[in-house]
Amino acid sequence: MVSKKEKSVVLIDGHSLAYRSFYAFIRNPLRNSKGQNTSAIFGFVNSLRKILNKFSPQYMAVIFDSGKETFRHKLYEEYKKERPETPGDLVSQLPLIKEVVSAYGIKVLEKEGFEADDILATIAKRLAKKGTKVYIVTSDKDLFQIIDENIFIYDVYKDIIYDKEKTKEKYGINDPSLMRDLLALAGDAIDNIPGVPGIGLKRALDIIHRYSSFEEALEKDERLKEHRQLAEISRILATIKTDVKTKIGLKELQIRKKSIPKLIKIFQELEFSSFLKELSTDMPKTVYQEPLFKDKAHIALKRKGIWGFKFSNQTLFVCDGEVDKKITDKDKIKEFLNSSEFKVGFDIKSQMHKLKEFGCELALPYFDTQIAAWLLDPTRKRYEFSDLMLHNFKLMPKMVSDTEQARLNLMLFQKLEPEILTFGLDKILYEIEMPLIKILYEMEERGVKIDTGLFKRLSTEIEIEKIKLKKSIYQQAGVEFNINSPQQLAKVLFEKLKLPKTKKTKTGFSTDSSVLAELAGSAPIVRDILRYREITKLQTTYLTPMQGLIKHETGRIHCQFNQTGTATGRLSSSNPNLQNIPIKGELGKKIREGFIAEPENLLISADYSQIELRILAYISNDEKLKEAFINNEDIHLQTATMVFNKPKDKVTNDERQIAKMVNYGLIYGLSDYGLASSLGISNEEARNIIDEFLGIYFQVAEWRQKIIEQTKETGYGKTIFGRIRPFPGIFAQNRTIYESTVRAAINHPIQGSAADIIKKAMIEIDQEMKNKNFCGGMIIQVHDELLFEVEKNRIKEAQMLIKEIMSKNYLDDVPLVVNIGIGENWAVAHETAK
């Protein structure tokens, strides 16, 4: 570790670090919600933080290449000519990297006509002569030549500081200055330093050790004599200049105070939440300052009865912008919560759970700042209170008192509600999302009964099957190995068993499910491996975790439903994630069998049939599509008859499946390549099928084009009911980002409207079931399905009520069809739905 007391200078080779940072994520680039590649900036900042922590320097600079030709290009035309062009995604990040460095208070340097290495070396040598320790951060070999008693190279990725001794260990040269000779002889492919033909690193080292100087080697070595001119040019190219004219000294390199507001703005734009959290340590402990609330009337928005609130530790903290109150009397808390006062809170569903423990309930009207922020931009990754304060006010609260949070909720309301009104989101907010909060809270409280015995039996069965599969796999492989290790599995399949190799990854040949599925037909061992993976995932993802989630007192799982978890408006769930339970197949069915009703109740499954295709028919106003649904036709069969030009009775099952894939695929932006891959046909055949489809349902094709144009015009998409989703990627130059955005933009009005419809149905069903005094109610919402637990003696009444509400004509003349089934467990209820 570097001594904190030591006066030291850190000089960073900016381009070198930016390149390494960018390519560290090349297989899985980091992007923010706008589709912007942020890999280089993230990696650079991460390294910068590590460097600052390790060296605690008082003096520092980051030096960049100017991007212009240098004296080396004039000397040797081919210099760096073979280096691939800098990727556009990296070039676009360099200005932001420089901005971040400056915001950290660190000097940014570049000089036209010289490379960063030359400027860096000049400054380093000048300071080292005065006894200052200089640490150079780079991955370039050429800078090793200036290492001396006071100059060191630091590899930030390997966390190694190179001095003379370590340089000798790494490169085999007795003195770091010999690095230029090594590069001159062996060449450097990265910088296109030619070197001497036929001489590699080993031979170059041999020459360096044999002769006392480079000049002697040129005179005596036969190969060098033959290529003397090339060797001399290579040595000039490899020699770092240490005499660049610059007035930069220690004073200019002093680190200034970092600009937290600038860093917050940049990190917020890039969505670097981990870095933002770290910045909070530099912020004051509290964020509330009286001046924020000087204009009392403005805070109250000229409306009476608007209160920010926070419930904590059996105390209700409220604020109306003028008065702060701390209510501890339970009756008064109840009175306030049930009043007609407009209550503004954050994550109100969580507040409801806390209030229930205290014996209180919260009644409408209320405004949830978290949900409002999500509605305005559902593409952000996080909606924690600190994120909202940062995003809206550039404030980074480290610690907020309960009183302050009540006040800050009012600030957020003041900022968010006008935006909600501007984007026409008030109906979505007040008529759908706010009433839904209490329904989800009650679903979480209600939970769902679990057949623990069945889950235990299933776990035992899986363990037995895993043992059998392992034995079979080892016998077929002829060796025991770790089946869960992709590297070991690849070695067995592709090296030992000589199975056909497919796509290659960084660590070897791929063994992902798509690859194994291709091999399964010809290799029984692969079928066993796929089955082993399938049941292992079932065990580790569902059976084992679920048993740990069962509440001992109730024998029920109390899943968490997340209102702000998706960009489409759909609900998500966690603890457990019900969305990921397999819909089809034996395993999905077995898990659903474990979700049961109490002895006196039954479960009702209500599932929308083809809701997304029906929405597509409605919003595209395609006559053929609408007609099929109005006449209750088999839409996939109808599509198949038209695409393949056959009468209905001549259409094969395979052709109907292709039509189904195209029908649904077009909602999700299925490409000809995607269809070709799924069906095992050529891209041209797939293109013809899609063109045929769009020719038949031409109004769908027109609607798709209209949606793309509207999204380009506004930058966001809308559902039937007005839910919005920003699509900044629609303006992207990167083709991959643009095409991905187009697919999402086409899908949003369909999937988002489906989310709105099921939420509207949930609200109305909940109200009706309460009006009619049902004991049970909704327990699960997943995909397009609702699951209810209802008393047996009222099951028919509940079925009729649910079906009637869910089938309402939200889509005018396009009917919504709901399949309803009942059973003692979820699997039976789902399977009997019709």
Residue positions per predicted region:
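Conserved beta-strand -> loop -> alpha-helix junction used to position metal-binding or nucleic-acid-contacting
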Residues: 11-16, 136-139, 143-144, 153-169, ...
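Function-dense linear segments that define catalytic or interfacial modules
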Residues: 375-399, 403, 409, 563-648
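Extended two-metal-dependent nuclease catalytic cores across DNA- and RNA-processing enzymes
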Residues: 2-6, 27-31, 81-247
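Conserved catalytic core of nucleic-acid polymerases
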Residues: 445, 551-554, 558-559, 564-566, ...
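Non-catalytic, usually N-terminal nucleic-acid engagement modules in DNA/RNA processing proteins
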Residues: 1-65, 71-72
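Conserved DEDDh/DEDDy metal-dependent 3′-5′ exonuclease domain
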Residues: 59-61, 113-115, 139, 296-297, ...
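Conserved "right-hand" nucleotidyltransferase catalytic core of DNA-directed polymerases
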Residues: 227-328, 342, 402-583, 602, ...
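C-terminal polymerase-core module
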Residues: 467, 471, 475-527, 695-743, ...
